[in-house]
């Protein structure tokens, strides 16, 4: 996580056969910085990239990723809406005006390249990465209705994206019923660590 531009954390899961990234980043620059960090650790670019939700800081780098992208069907629906809005060349300026972090990330840029994910799922799907399993599932969340989480049972790690946060695209509204449903879902999963996109990893009981 990079607070000066509010870049979300991009995670990497390595199996014996395949690798997986969590989220596609804020921009082409974000993706390139992530891949540069992977190369410095002698890690290859990911075979799969799973999107946690449609918000632009998690998806506007999707056009520059390697491998195959995966998202919930609602995520692609929202991204298609963003594509339509981006047909208006002024849309990037509107986003810059509305979000100072976006303005910093896209300083000097005057166009957007918004794409949808290659693979859509509805309820859940599983990837065998080679002695590492990624359980990908949709869940109720107060943050966004297309929320995807990724559970790695061998590591007892649960990637939550921004799922516990309020809905910033709805006036910062926090639906407590949805939050309670999400908390119950988290507690039902055998994980030791929960990884959110904009803060340090937490132990489950935190």
Model-derived features: where do they sit?
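Conserved beta-strand hairpin/beta-sheet module of binuclear metal-dependent hydrolase folds
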Residues: 1-36, 148-162
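Active-site environment of divalent metal-dependent phosphoester hydrolases
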Residues: 7, 28-29, 54-60, 76-79, ...
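Divalent metal-coordination and catalytic microenvironments
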Residues: 13, 23, 38, 53, ...
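Active-site neighborhood of phospho(di)ester-bond hydrolases with catalytic His/Asp-centered motifs
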Residues: 21-24, 46-55, 70-73, 138-140, ...
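Active-site metal-binding motif and surrounding structural segment of the metallo-beta-lactamase
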Residues: 29-75, 187-193
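Divalent-metal (often Zn2+) His-rich catalytic cores of metallo-beta-lactamase-fold enzymes
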Residues: 72, 151, 178-206
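Metallo-beta-lactamase
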Residues: 80-138
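Active-site-proximal loop/helix segments of hydrolase catalytic cores
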Residues: 133-186
């Amino acid at each position: 996580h990079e607070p000066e531009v509010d870049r979300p954390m991009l995670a990497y899961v390595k199996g014996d056969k395949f690798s997986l990234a969590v989220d596609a980043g804020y921009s082409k620059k974000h993706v390139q910085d992530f891949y540069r960090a992977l190369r410095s650790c002698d890690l290859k670019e990911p075979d799969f990239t799973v999107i946690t939700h449609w918000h632009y800081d998690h998806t506007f780098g999707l056009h520059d990723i390697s491998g195959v992208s995966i998202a919930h069907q609602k995520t692609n629906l929202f991204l298609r809406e963003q594509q339509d809005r981006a047909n208006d060349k002024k849309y990037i300026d509107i986003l810059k005006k509305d979000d100072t972090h976006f303005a910093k990330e896209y300083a000097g840029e005057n166009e957007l390249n918004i794409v949808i994910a290659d693979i859509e799922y509805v309820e859940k799907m599983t990837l065998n990465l080679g002695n590492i399993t990624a359980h990908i599932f949709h869940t109720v969340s107060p943050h966004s209705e297309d929320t995807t989480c990724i559970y790695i049972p061998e590591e007892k790690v649960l990637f939550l994206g921004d799922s516990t946060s309020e809905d910033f695209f709805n006036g910062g509204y926090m639906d407590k019923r949805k939050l309670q449903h999400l908390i119950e879902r988290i507690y039902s999963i055998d994980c030791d660590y929960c990884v959110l996109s904009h803060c340090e990893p937490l132990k489950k009981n935190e």
